[in-house]
Amino acid sequence: MGKKEKKEKNTNTSLFDMDANPSFKRSLPIALQHLLAMIVGNTLPAIVLTGQLANTEFAVSAQDAVYLIQAGMFVAAIATFLQLYPVFKVGAKLPVIMGVSFAYIPVLTSIGIKYGIGAVYGAQLVGGVIAFIVGMNIKRIYKFFPPMVSGTVVLTIGLSLYSVALNYMAGGNGNPNQGDLVYWGVAFLTLAVTLCCNMFGKGIIKLAAILIGIGVGYVASIFFGIVHFDGVKEAAWLTLPRIMPFKLEFPIDAVITMSVMFVVNSIQAVGDLSSTTAGGLNRVPTADELEGGIKANGLASVIGSLIGGMPTATYSQNVGIVSLTKVVARKVFAITASLILVAGFIPKFGALMLSVPQAVIGGATITVFAQITMSGMKLIMSDEMSSRNVTIVGLGIALGMGIVQLGDQALSRFPEWFRMVFTSSPVVLATLVVFLLNIIMPKKTIAEEEAERKAMDDK
């Protein structure tokens, strides 16, 4: 009986069954859609990080910058395969595409500027272990992170990234011609094309909006003479991932900051996985799927820290494709992951992406950061906006954004590690504020608050 069932399972060629085995010919078009939807987003975090470090004492070489893009491809492929085909219950066994996450950029940048790239990956290694532990205990701790709390974190991440995008649109740090009209023109051309494709395009045009926007901006940049191909010419055609490409360092303040980010983003992963199962399978994820998915994310981040890849997350644009097409056959996603992996072996690809002017990157990423911000607002609004919740969210954002804007001078009398944790990024302080206030402040619904006010009037 078992053999018969196995045979029937192997002959199932449906695109709409997770365990089916559709033909390569039928699977490839959907797999390419997923690839186009994530490929640019997967390369941009490494470009942004190396760009932010470019004019500091910890600037990375052009060769290492190319390698970071490659490593991001390796890690995205590894994380996706883990989620598709779990190993020892590490993985969700769900149809998802993983990619390098923008959510960590503010913290990664602040750590890199202060301590260098080795500290970035040292802190990430510890954070990945923390995420794995969170996954093991997700059933017990999830209740402490309602949408209001996780939404405030996501909103703060989006707000903190705007200055990065706008700086890039102006030409980038260290550019003697920063602010030139050419940079702003190319940036807004990229933004306009991206918006038009996203708002008016359909099918593959809509899915590849950012890629098309960058392509048009890139061609315009070549015309204006602000693209340099030296790095592309010098890059090799093939290379293998390197083990420990950077010496890992573990500054305590960097580790604390990164650990907080991993805890919060692990909780956020619950929402990402829920979106996948709701859109493609019309159900909520099981406890085992949530646990396995978060543990896989943690393990992928640990592996990433050892080969130079940044932390990963589920890509919402790929979740959107699942919801739209209802294609959930894991083979389709495995083909996408395989293509991502192949790209990771080709330095020319990374060098080509690195040759994209910062103005073009800024024009493309401003839309991504705006979407992150609005996603946070939607999460917050999914909870009741009672006076209690409004107060908690408002204080979290005010303190988080306010302290960072003031900089070190606001906490000049505090220890250095304390200043690093709370002034490097608004995300950490905002997270702690909303988390603690949500536990401490008595929970009241809008109806209960109205009843209290009515009782006061009656007196």
Ranges and model annotations:
Residues 1-29, 230-242, 278-285, 293, ...:
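Intrinsically disordered, low-complexity non-transmembrane regions of multi-pass membrane transporters
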Residues 1-95, 103-111:
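N-terminal signal-anchor module of multipass membrane proteins
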Residues 5-12, 40-46, 50, 190-200, ...:
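Juxtamembrane interface elements at the cytosolic ends of transmembrane helices
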Residues 22-29, 51-64, 80-90, 110-119, ...:
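Short juxtamembrane and helix-loop transition motifs at transmembrane-helix boundaries
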Residues 25-41, 179-191, 208-209, 224, ...:
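Hydrophobic, membrane-embedded alpha-helices of multi-pass small-molecule transporters
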Residues 50-91, 259-330, 456-457:
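Membrane-embedded helical hairpins/re-entrant loop segments and their flanking transmembrane helices
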Residues 67-68, 89-103, 143-152, 205-211, ...:
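Short, non-helical or kinked segments that cap or interrupt transmembrane helices
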Residues 111-230, 337, 342-450:
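Membrane-embedded alpha-helical modules
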